[in-house]
Amino acid sequence: MPVLRSIRARLSAEQPLAGVRIGACLHVTAETANLVLALRAGGAEVHLCAANPYVTQHDVAEALGEHVHVGDYRDGLAAVAAAEPDLVLDDGAELIAALHGSGLRGATEETRSGLVHLRTLDVQCPVLAVNEAASERGINDRFGTGQSALDGIVGATHMLLAGQTVVVLGYGWSGLGVALRARGAGASVIVCEVDPIRALEARMEGFEVLPSLEAAARGDVFITVTGSRDVLRAEHFTRMKDGAVLANAGHFDVEISLADLRALAGDRHAQALPLVEQYEVEDGRRLNLLARGQVVNLAAAQGHPAAVMDVSFALQALSAVHLASADALAPGVQAVPASIDDEVARLKLVSLGVEIDVETPGQQAYRGRWSPA
C-alpha cells in the first residue's frame, strides 16, 4: 500500500494526531491494519471494532494488540464508545449515530448507506463523506466492488459467468462496476433501479433496464448493490428460476430478505457448498444464497484488493488529520476537501509510475477567467 506508506512516513515525522483518540468501526483486515498503524504513527490512540464480525481476520486483530474489539458487534461498538474518542472513522454510521451528540470533534463515513442514514439526522459534528470523494467512487466503488463482488460469487459457486443472465439491483458507482465486470465476463446484464437518472445512465450504457419483478423471472444470478433493505423478497423468490444464485454486494445482511426466504422454504434447506445455502421452495425450485446474505466480497472472498484500499484509507488518514487540525468546522455531512482528494490521486499516480501534464500559466489564467469567485 504505497500511498498509505508515504502518508504514514509523513505523519510519523509531523505527529499531527498527537494526543488525539480515534474510534474506528471498520472491517478488521490486513488493509485496515495499515490504516491503524499509520494513525498510530501520527500520534493517535486508536480504538477499533469490527464493522462486520463475520469477516474479521483474527490474526490481524491479534497482531494489532490493544484497543481492538472483534467479538459481538454491539459489544464492540460499546467498547469503542466507552473510550470517548475525539474522532470517529465509521463504516455504516452506527458509531457516529451513537456519539455525534457527545462532543465529537469530527468523523468520517466510508459507505453510501451510512451517509444516507446520517443525512436523516441532525448531526452535531462535522462528518466528511469519504464515500463521495471522487477518488473513492472511481477506484473503490467502481473497480473495487466490481471486481471483488464477482470474485466472491465465482469463488463460492465455481460457476462460469459467460452466458448467464446477471441481474444487478442498484446502479450507483458500485452497481456500475459490478455490471461492467459481469458484462466483461460474458454475462448478459439486467439493471434494476428506483432512481430515474441512474436507470437512464444504465440504459445509455447499453444495459437492459427492467423492474425487479420482471427481472426476477429471467435472472440466473442476482446481485444487490443498493444500501437498502428487502430488495429481494418473497414476491421475487416466487418468480425465480430453479438454481438461481443470490448475492449481496451492498451493506449489511438486509438487502436479501432472509426471513422471506426461510418462510418459503421451511425446513427444506441445506449447505450445498461451504458458502452456499440451498433453499427449496414448495414447487421444488432451489435458490442458492451466498455467504448467509452477508457482503459477498468480504464473506466469500478477500474484499477489495490492497491497491484499492490504499486509496480509501489514504483518504481516511488525511481526513482524520484535517478534522484534528482544522479550525472549528460546521456540523453536518460535508465533502472531503478537494485538496485531499487531489493529493491522494496524485500519490496513487506516482505509485503507478504515471506522470501527467501541468497547465501552462496561460492556461491557468484562461480557466481562471471563468472560475466562480
Identify the meaning behind each predicted range.
Residues 1-17, 48-56, 61-164:
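Glycine/serine-rich phosphate-binding loop and adjoining beta1-alpha1 elements at the start
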Residues 43-45, 103-104, 123-125, 186-187, ...:
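A short helix->loop->beta-strand "cap" motif at the edges of active sites that frequently abuts
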Residues 29-44, 147-219, 224-226:
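Glycine-rich phosphate/diphosphate-binding loop of Rossmann-like nucleotide-binding domains
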Residues 25, 91, 223-226, 248-249:
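Short, well-ordered coil/turn residues at beta-beta hairpins
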Residues 50, 88-90, 101-113, 237-280, ...:
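ADP-ribose/adenylate-binding Rossmann-like module
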